[in-house]
């Protein structure tokens, strides 16, 4: 059979980063927090993620937050403020702006099916 070669360091970093993002995106919104947990520099983390995935380290955090926000907006009746809080946004205006920046639509409009 074919022997699988050990993952190279780039893939390892990407894997570890992805797992950390899925675990911590609600409280860690900044790449620096992940780099610090992984004991590597921000530039090293960013360039490695870019090479391994053709997306940026920041994009992966944003995608995790937006995916969760969209699911909550569609599946729960919790107030938007609470959804924002659950995702680490203390300020509902900031959550609204973040959501709209990355989706082109407000959380309220998204919830009302205007996508």
Place the predicted regions along the sequence by residue.
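Short hydrophobic/aromatic patch on the recognition helix
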Residues: 45, 94-95, 99
